[in-house]
């Protein structure tokens, strides 16, 4: 079987979960640190209404900036997120069948579910979880979402997160992200991951670690914090949550610059968590839950 390209992996995941009945959503147009931060997870996992969706989410972690020189760590990367609420009883079987669709023969590989409970301090979110290892390499994360914004999830939703670069490294049998086959073409039409993303990786690394203006970021954080609280009071939790995401990203940028002390870091985490919580509470209130 021909090894899937990066974009074929995404299309295969989308088709598989679409056939299961998930709505295929688009990436959220904001700077987020992980697919979990998409409002389709944070807001929609709350409340009692069923919700089954899947989407790709480009994600940014300024602290992982390496100027494009690290084999598998970048400040910008892609995740594929699946949310199933309520969680189906056969979720593990569904996941394993999905691996087979990606060309991973379960009979010839060691698939393990390794307990790894998940927590996001800035979202006030946590859940029971497992890393999925294939021949000793983590390829996905399972989480039974128990709370978001400090609010209990009823019913519990299942979140499956695929680290697309890591999954592609395994499927294609290469060691360096920039060498990944992006589009499955040959000759002039062939694209490697490095051709698509690595100049941006170099430039954003320089910005994140050297040129970002910490005083400006501190002002922006405070502005987004105030705006979020104002919008919640105006019964607009969705634009308020956008401001929460901005504040979270500004915090991550400040952290990458190394200008926040350990004590200050804890304070900033609590401030972002408060914003996430009031957005979630207002969302539930307006939903009649």
Curated annotation (Swiss-Prot):
Signal peptide per UniProt: none
Biological process according to GO: glycyl-tRNA aminoacylation
Enzyme class, UniProt record, top EC level: ligase
Keywords for this protein: Aminoacyl-tRNA synthetase, ATP-binding, Cytoplasm, Ligase, Nucleotide-binding, Protein biosynthesis
Catalytic reaction(s) noted: tRNA(Gly) + glycine + ATP = glycyl-tRNA(Gly) + AMP + diphosphate
Annotated InterPro entries: aa-tRNA-synth_II/BPL/LPL, Gly-tRNA-synth_heterodimer, Gly-tRNA_ligase_asu
Disulfide bonds: none
Subcellular location: Cytoplasm
Gene Ontology molecular function: any one: glycine-tRNA ligase activity
Superkingdom in the source lineage: Bacteria
Similarity field: Belongs to the class-II aminoacyl-tRNA synthetase family.
HAMAP family: Gly_tRNA_synth_alpha
Protein name per UniProt: Glycine--tRNA ligase alpha subunit
The species this protein was found in: Rickettsia akari (strain Hartford)
Lineage: Bacteria, Pseudomonadati, Pseudomonadota, Alphaproteobacteria, Rickettsiales
């Amino acid at each position: 079987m021909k090894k899937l390209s990066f974009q074929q992996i995404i299309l295969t995941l989308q088709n598989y979960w679409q056939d299961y009945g998930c709505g295929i959503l688009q990436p959220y147009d904001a700077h987020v640190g992980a697919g979990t931060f998409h409002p389709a997870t944070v807001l929609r996992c709350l409340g009692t209404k069923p919700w089954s969706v899947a989407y790709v989410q480009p994600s940014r972690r300024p602290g992982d900036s390496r100027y494009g020189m690290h084999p598998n760590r970048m400040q910008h990367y892609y995740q594929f997120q699946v949310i199933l609420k309520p969680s189906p009883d056969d979720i593990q079987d569904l996941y394993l069948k999905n691996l087979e669709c990606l060309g991973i023969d379960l009979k010839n590989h060691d698939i393990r579910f390794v307990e790894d409970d998940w927590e996001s301090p800035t979202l006030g979110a946590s859940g029971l979880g497992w890393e999925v290892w294939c021949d000793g390499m983590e390829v996905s994360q399972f989480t039974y979402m128990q709370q978001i914004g400090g609010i209990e999830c009823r019913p519990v939703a299942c979140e499956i997160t695929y680290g697309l670069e890591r999954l592609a490294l395994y499927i294609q049998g290469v060691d360096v992200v920039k060498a990944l086959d992006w589009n499955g073409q040959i000759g002039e039409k062939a694209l490697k991951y490095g051709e698509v993303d690595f100049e941006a990786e170099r430039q954003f690394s320089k910005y994140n670690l050297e040129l970002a203006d910490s005083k400006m970021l501190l002002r922006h954080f405070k502005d987004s914090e105030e705006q979020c609280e104002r919008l919640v009071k105006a019964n607009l939790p969705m634009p308020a949550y956008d401001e929460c995401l901005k504040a979270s990203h500004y915090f991550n940028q400040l952290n990458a610059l190394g200008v926040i002390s350990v004590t200050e870091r804890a304070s900033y985490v609590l401030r972002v968590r408060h914003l996430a919580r009031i957005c979630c509470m207002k969302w539930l209130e307006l939903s009649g839950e």
